[in-house]
Amino acid sequence: MSSIARPPDPCLVAIILIVRSRAGPRFVFHYPPNPLSENGLKPALRSRRTSRSRTGQGYKSNDSSSSEESGSSSDEDEDEHQHQLHSQSNNHSQTHLSGSVVSARRSSNFGLDDHVTMSVSPGGDSQRAGSIGSSRTLFRRRGGNSDVEEESGAGSDRQEDGAGTAGGPNRPPWESLLGLPADVWEKLLSPSPAWHKRRFEVGINDLAFIGWPVFVREDGTWRKQKRKKKKEKKKARAEWEGGELGHNENSEDAPDGEDGDGEGGGGLKLIVASTETLSPKHMTFSEAKRASVASNLAARASSDCLDVDDKDSMTMFNVVFVLDPPLLEYSMRIKELYDNIIKKFAKALKWEQARTDYVWREAQHITHLKEKAKERRTSLNTLYSELINQSSLARAIYTVFNSISASKIASVPLSPDVSISLQIPPLTSTPYLSGPADKAYPGLWLTTADSVTPVDDPTAEEIAAPHQVLAKNFALLLLDNEATILKDVEASGGALAPALAHYLRCSKPTKSFAQISATSGIPLSTIQMLASHLVYWRRARAIPPIHQRDTYIVSPNCDLSKLEVATAAYQAAFPTLPSLPKMLSALSGTPRPYGSFIPSKDHKETYFAILAWLLRGGWVTQLRSFARVKVTPEIKMAVEVALRREEVDKYLRKSRPSGPGKSGIDGEEGSGAEEVDDASSSSSSSLSSHGSGEETPMPGRYKLESEMRLEHSLLDRNTSLRTASLILFPHRASPLESRWLEEIVSQFPDKPRSANRLRGHGSGSRGGEGDPECAGICTPMKDLWPTYIKYFNGLDALEKIPIRESLKRKLAWQVLTRLGMVTSQQTSIELDPREQVLVSVRHWNNELIYFQFLIFPRDINSIIPHHAR
């Protein structure tokens, strides 16, 4: 598989709603009505299915290491499911679906007709590699031992007119899915209570069935009731879990006794005002609690009046998502859909079920409509139109399927009081250009500036949770007009609306989050939360702050097919300024700071707006600088001579106390040490005389043994002393690399050459030695080195230094120029060869730079693209 990060690919085939009452499981609803039809089956899905091998091997699934996501279904349930699945699949024939034109290829309905192979996974990150063979003998042998009491009465509650077979004459088309009758699916996808609030996964040939089953509690309620405290504490305004800030949700699936979703629990309190912005209407925490308590009390009162054998109460519901992910991306696609959609949608339904008995009421309503349609012999399309129009739950499933399949945000109103938004976070940028065998995504932002990775934030943990807080040194680039976003925020209302509106008015792409916090008075943590909210919901993008000293080039990944449309939009936004083709042509030349394109100070804000427009559309990208410390052979030799002298001195100090009575062996060792000392001294003298232009004659100077001794380091025999090296990670330098760095610093001059030139100006005059504008020129490099060295790892862009270290960019680039940073601008700084210790390149991709640094040819310009020099 390619290393290129791919955008969300939901691979959705269908969504199924299964409920279980005391009468047994029920196949309530599924969408689309016929996933195998030409309209329901996507071309990508067909190509994936036909490209897979049919070797007869099943899927392998690995148990999750998480205790919350682990667990296993009972053998009895699995045996019953397998037995029913086998018996039904052998008897079924062609299913009649309205509008379907796939009868000719029905023999390949994902392999469900003839060879149904299944594996049940307890959750976790599954890996589907081949398949388990069709164990029909095993199904028959173990099927007789099944014991599913709750499903025993299912037949009496369902159709009695020949519906037991898939090809029954009176079976309506909506009572089958993927070529199998509904009673097979309702038993297969109705797990035991051991799966309560855990990832339920079933693999059947090329399809994966993923759900998050929810069971009623033993006391008949759907939420754990907290004991009332004597002193009522003032409760903050909060919403149900899983809303628009649900992407920051860290609560795990708690067991029934530790229900994290209950009132007063962490579930509700963690998502303060989470669903308010850009959603219709919401309930406060106190209102939700009162409604939930009233609903539970009513449920208890009604249950007391009902007979113990009452069959009209729901005990479980399971919303199952049917997926067909690519084989090599199976775990990744399953995980992203489970974490972002399946689990959150089921939690929202659980919350509404506990509050208003929502799922059970809607399930009964859908069943009633289906029974009426069966009596009237309504067509499939007509029935689904009625269901979507009259049932909010059917409409919610319809909305989720269509929106998530298109990688859009699904805004789902469950009731007048609650609306949720679900999405799979899209890919906003890529550090790679697609190769010949990879699918191209033109227009995607090409950069390695990741606002949350440990590379861009050294203080971040290496194993960071998804959707972590944005780095404080990044800025916010709105992806739509500010007035439009403000209008939507103000219209949505909610607790977040005033804070978001205030932040949007203060935010600028030229100011980092930390700078906005300092000037506006908004706490940094609040700004990071609001910015994360906007980024997650596709209203903004986190970027390095725009600056006139930064360099921008036309992105190699820009979508030139949209140039004509973009030119018209650009002309409407900036009618009196150079056209889009002219701006792109100017930025395609020799890279230079963006400030050189600005005609005057009066045009500064306007040209920043142009740059923001170009970045928003992926037309340009920042040309970033990367550097590593170069260790020359002279530095290596000096360190090696010092190391060998230290070893000889250490040996001589140990041998001196032995006195004149030392043994012959000691004498031989002493003579050997003297020989090494002589060789080191001769090499040192040779180097010093070579540096001064003189050559001191020395006995044995040209001996091969002495020459061989100084070809490799004493500390690392694999390190050559005759070639230059790069220090990959200065903050994790090896002992030998640390000695090299010490030697480099020791050779820095105490007084910079530029300081001598500026000394005549005086300390108080403009441009003199005491001028802060010249601090980068006049300050000794030994004092500046500790601040800068941690960025010379080839991974951190040097443009970060002024932002992170709160330095003026002019000062930072003066120091980098002294260290050997190559720029396109001519500089008047007098350079000292002793300070030129960097090898630098400019590119958008630090991975490419890392590869270039590793091969390190003598002429590094030979591998750097022309536009990156």
Curated annotation (Swiss-Prot):
Biased composition (Polar residues): 128-137
Keyword Signal: yes
Compositional bias annotation for Basic and acidic residues: 237-250
Stretches that traverse the bilayer: none
Signal peptide, first to last residue: 1-23
Keywords: Meiosis, Signal
Pfam families tied to this protein: HTH_NPRL3, NPR3
Comp. bias intervals (Basic residues): 223-236
Regions of compositional bias (Low complexity) in chain numbering: 61-73, 85-98, 680-689
Region described as Disordered: 30-175, 222-266, 652-700, 751-773
Acidic residues biased stretches: 251-262, 666-678
GO biological process, one term: positive regulation of autophagy
Top-level taxonomic group: Eukaryota
Keyword Signal among record annotations: yes
One GO CC term on file: GATOR1 complex
Physiological role: Mediates inactivation of the TORC1 complex in response to amino acid starvation. Required for meiotic nuclear division.
Family: Belongs to the NPR3 family.
Protein name: Nitrogen permease regulator 3
Organism of origin: Aspergillus clavatus (strain ATCC 1007 / CBS 513.65 / DSM 816 / NCTC 3887 / NRRL 1 / QM 1276 / 107)
Designated gene of the protein: npr3
